[in-house]
Each structure stands twice: as structure tokens, then as C-alpha cells.
């Protein structure tokens, strides 16, 4: 197998994504007063988006100093980012897990699309909404 230049870019992006998610996880679970579902949401979205996810986290959720989280996330655009992250984390996780499963099973594209849609919806609703929102 011959490596192409894009392979190095992809490898670097994966490393950056893992490091970014590790930073967000450390910061979120070290004392952020955010709900657990949002902590996991930002970690997962950062894992999927890499450094762009860190940028979203720092701009929209990381409190500048202890005790300022509520005031920091009060602007509507930050609440919108939080809502989007919450939804994307649940739905995307279901879709990614379903895509892995359907690829391993070698299912046809129509089944792949259907299973990914159902899994994304179900994972978002039953895990990120019902389970984590308690």
C-alpha cells in the first residue's frame, strides 16, 4: 500500500481530534457545572470535529473563571450552540455506530441509510434525551 499525502493529513487530524477531545473531557469533568449530557455532548462533538470542536467549546461553554458559567452561557447564540451540540452528539453517535455495523455486515446501501436514520433518531431520543436528561 502506497501512502498518499492526504493520508498524513488524515492521520494528523485524527491525532488532533483525540487530543482536542481529551482536553475538553479533562476540562469538562474537572469542575464544569454543566449537566452531564452537555459534558458528554461537547466531548463527542469535539472528537468528531477536532480543533473546531475545541473552538466551539471555548467560545460557547468554557467559563472564563469559576462561578461565572450561568452568566457566560446566557447569550442566545451560546445557548443555540449548546442545543446544537446536544442534538449532534446524540444523533451523530447513533449514525456512526450504525455505519460501522452496516459496513461490517456488508448490507446494501438502502439498508445502510435506513438503519443509520433509525439509529441516529433512536440514540438521540432514547440515550441523549430520555436517559441523560434525568
Describe the role of every protein-language-model region.
Residues 1-134:
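Alpha-helical membrane segments of multi-pass proteins
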